[in-house]
């Protein structure tokens, strides 16, 4: 039987939620009630699959942990008052920490004036953010399109490349195995994992996937396209594959891809949604090789962990295809004043506090520690790798990776696997993580592996 809509029920539910939003603290009974509600609502109205996922990576009934607030720049607090060191960083959102006061203040000040733009008049913060990114981005990147997520920034990049290259008779994209560019239809066509792709087949035509880091395979794809008349419009890739398991290509790979793009008249699209904004020790990961893309995709940390925002930055030559009709590709909320305020404040914090350099230094400390643990527990850990504060520990199998995440949760450190590689646990903390907390994370990882080793020996 169909359930009849109930405005009274919706009103009561929204009022209850608003009451919770107003509260800074909850008593014990309120916490227990909220946990029960959240679990029930996820099961009945969000997606029960999320609960099953939480059960698979936790133990002892901890799957129902409900986050409540930020504890500090680098920690989260759940409804039970337990504080967790955040080594997941919302998959790369919290580069400047949780509730960074500079970012929060900028958003609050803008909120007091004008939360959203009129859509008709010229909005100043969108102009100022575009100018700031043009000054910050490498090479000739000059014009920015703003959206709300990384997937949207990739969609915009693909459409820009199509609009630029279609008149030139070039329609095919090269992406790479292990790639993750998002899950909307266009971005998913570039993403490489069959689990995400298969239910939505057929995807957009015109995408080839070659092995990541293999410049010979990339060169062959270009040559074959030339021979068959199916010329390459653009290459899209991540400088470091995040969801693929934090996979670093050989040194010089990006440089060689850039050369191929220049040789064959293709555009180079770099997806820095996860690697950008200081994460790898440079503001943008492509700067490690001084490579200049034609189109650059940003999101995640651009909003400072306070507002969602994505950006697609392109050279004037490429972006000019939108000059005659700027309404060819737009979005209602993209570049809104609150999001732009957050992004401007985030860039200011990253530069003022030199957080990219801090990411390099602290990342070296953490990675050295993880590599030492890999040497001590070779039957559990296959590899530890990364750059800056984007790291991964690869385990011998999926189950071991899940067990490590569970043990770290017991140690009150939040980590998780990557979407394209379940054996790999991602370590992606805020760039503001202190040296003391870095040491605590390494201690917790040692304790977790020791507990896992005992379990293995008892079997």
From Swiss-Prot:
Coiled-coil region(s): none
Name of the featured protein: Putrescine aminotransferase
BP terms from Gene Ontology: L-lysine catabolic process; putrescine catabolic process
Organism phylogeny: Bacteria, Pseudomonadati, Pseudomonadota, Gammaproteobacteria, Enterobacterales
UniProt key word Protein biosynthesis: no
Residues recorded as bearing N6-(pyridoxal phosphate)lysine in the entry: 300
SUPFAM superfamilies: PLP-dependent transferases
PROSITE patterns membership: AA_TRANSFER_CLASS_3
EC supergroup of this enzyme: transferase
NCBIfam families in UniProt: PRK11522.1, putres_am_tran
Function: Catalyzes the aminotransferase reaction from putrescine to 2-oxoglutarate, leading to glutamate and 4-aminobutanal, which spontaneously cyclizes to form 1-pyrroline. This is the first step in one of two pathways for putrescine degradation, where putrescine is converted into 4-aminobutanoate (gamma-aminobutyrate or GABA) via 4-aminobutanal. Also functions as a cadaverine transaminase in a a L-lysine degradation pathway to succinate that proceeds via cadaverine, glutarate and L-2-hydroxyglutarate.
Similarity remark: Belongs to the class-III pyridoxal-phosphate-dependent aminotransferase family. Putrescine aminotransferase subfamily.
